[in-house]
């Protein structure tokens, strides 16, 4: 129950914060067109800003309450403000919470003030800057700051969240723009709508690319080379789900940008234009629903044990892939060939989209290239695995462990591997690798500690 309250608190405050930030960025961009400042649909969302700022504050209170309960291990502290204040005063998390709460309160005050004034572009720029403050402060309570509280660790994650807000936060404004009543006296024309949407679409493309780049940087630090955890841990499965939802969103955004928006601006039949507007309304709504789900998954992911700290107690597959599967130079070149072919497949997808290939051609050609790349590279990278392959000792090695290991080695391994583990084979040809050499030959890189444990216990 506490975990559910914590997840909903984090999700609600982050969603509200991103919407205020993204809408203000969108308005600051489109306010270059003066006609936008006199429309009613923009007033509707402006009136929601103070309410959303209030949601941010209530979400932060929920975060403090659940954090206190989890930190103390006492469920009743969820409702005990006195213990909350102890956490706020005595912990670093509490100090960061104060900064987040003060910045959210400032955001509430400034939104209440500006909705009473005549609209100016600099108002939205200022509100966007203020809305960014709670977001940036929240990154100091993330996994990125857990290992090292430094600019290099936190900045990529902060930029990643702000870029996400630029895209996701603008979706409600775009929906209200699409659903604005054309019969109103201050309504904007379909041409103006398409102009605003096209301008945002031009901004969204580099934003999404930078979002992917910063996401890769942040994820790489949290995975730390332990890529097997991506298919065998809670963090990995949540990340895969997040990427799957993102792929659907990008597909919708591609069709919005390249199919329906051009029809709105192209002179032609009104029926085609109405159909494109209907499609935009339908699919942008669907995109927003997926975006809400994406933010929820990202919120849960941000509070899940990172992949680099995950313990894979039971590897569920009878195989694994490794670049150390072979030390044969020819085999390694073949693996590189397969990887190059996979990159060619990605290039074929990009070329097909740019050249407007048919759907069949766009699926078949990259599909054949991907299958060929897999058939070339994967067999050479495949190693046999066991449930214990990625198992790690739960305690550090000590003198007793080493002593017991020496006895086991002397009783079971000396005959083949020698007393020092350098092997017993008398190899004359330097090109031939001694398979019994456990000390100096590179073939031992294909074995994990868990594999060795499996061999000793079976």
Model-derived features with residue positions:
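Polytopic transmembrane helical bundles with strong interfacial aromatic enrichment
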Residues: 1-382, 386-388
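Conserved beta-strand positions that form and line the central face of beta-propeller blades
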Residues: 87, 391-395, 437
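Inter-heme linker and motif-flanking segments adjacent to c-type heme-binding CXXCH motifs
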Residues: 146, 422-425, 444-445
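Periplasmic c-type cytochrome electron-transfer domains
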Residues: 363, 367-368, 374, 402, ...
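Electrostatic cytochrome c docking/interface patches
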Residues: 385-408
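Periplasmic/extracellular electron-transfer cofactor-ligation site
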Residues: 400, 406, 410-433, 458
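Extracytoplasmic electron-transfer domains, predominantly the class I c-type cytochrome c fold
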Residues: 430-458
């Amino acid at each position: 129950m506490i975990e559910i309250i914590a997840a909903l608190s984090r999700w609600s405050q982050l969603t509200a914060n991103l919407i205020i930030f993204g809408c203000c960025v969108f308005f600051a961009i489109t306010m270059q067109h003066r006609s936008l400042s006199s429309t009613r649909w923009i007033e509707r969302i402006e009136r929601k800003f103070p309410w959303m700022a209030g949601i941010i504050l209530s979400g932060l209170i929920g975060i403090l309450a659940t954090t206190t309960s989890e930190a103390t291990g006492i469920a009743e502290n969820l409702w005990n403000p006195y213990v909350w204040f102890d956490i706020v005063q005595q912990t670093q998390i509490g100090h960061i919470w104060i900064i987040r709460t003060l910045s959210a309160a400032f955001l509430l005050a400034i939104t209440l003030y500006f909705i009473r004034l005549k609209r100016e572009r600099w108002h939205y720029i200022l509100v966007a800057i203020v809305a960014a403050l709670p977001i940036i402060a929240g990154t100091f309570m993330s996994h990125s700051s857990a290992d090292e509280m430094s600019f290099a660790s936190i900045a990529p994650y902060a930029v990643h969240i702000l870029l996400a807000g630029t895209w996701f936060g603008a979706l409600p404004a775009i929906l209200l723009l699409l659903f604005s009543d054309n019969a109103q006296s201050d309504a904007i024309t379909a041409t103006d709508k398409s102009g605003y949407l096209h301008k945002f679409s031009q901004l969204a493309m580099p934003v999404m690319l930078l979002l992917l780049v910063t996401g890769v940087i942040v994820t790489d630090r949290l995975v730390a080379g332990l890529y097997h955890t991506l298919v065998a841990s809670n963090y990995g499965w949540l990340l895969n789900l997040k990427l799957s939802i993102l792929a659907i969103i990008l597909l919708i955004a591609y069709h919005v940008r390249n199919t329906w928006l051009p029809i709105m601006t192209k002179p032609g039949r009104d029926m085609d234009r109405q159909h494109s507007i209907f499609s935009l309304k339908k699919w942008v709504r669907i995109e927003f629903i997926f975006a809400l789900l994406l933010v929820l998954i990202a919120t849960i992911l941000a509070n899940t044990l990172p992949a680099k700290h995950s313990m894979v107690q039971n590897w569920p597959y009878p195989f694994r892939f490794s670049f150390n599967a072979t030390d044969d130079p020819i085999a390694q070149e073949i693996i590189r060939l397969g990887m190059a072919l996979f990159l060619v497949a990605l290039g074929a997808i990009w070329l097909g989209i740019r050249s407007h290939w048919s759907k069949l051609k766009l699926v078949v050609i990259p599909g054949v290239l991907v299958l060929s790349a897999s058939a070339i590279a994967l067999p050479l990278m495949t190693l046999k695995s066991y449930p214990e392959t990625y198992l790690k000792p739960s305690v550090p090695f000590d003198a007793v462990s080493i002593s017991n290991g020496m006895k086991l080695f002397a009783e079971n391994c000396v005959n083949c591997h020698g007393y020092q583990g350098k092997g017993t084979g008398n190899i004359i040809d330097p090109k031939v690798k001694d398979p019994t050499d456990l000390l100096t030959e590179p073939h031992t890189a294909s074995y994990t500690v868990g594999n060795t444990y499996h061999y000793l216990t079976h």
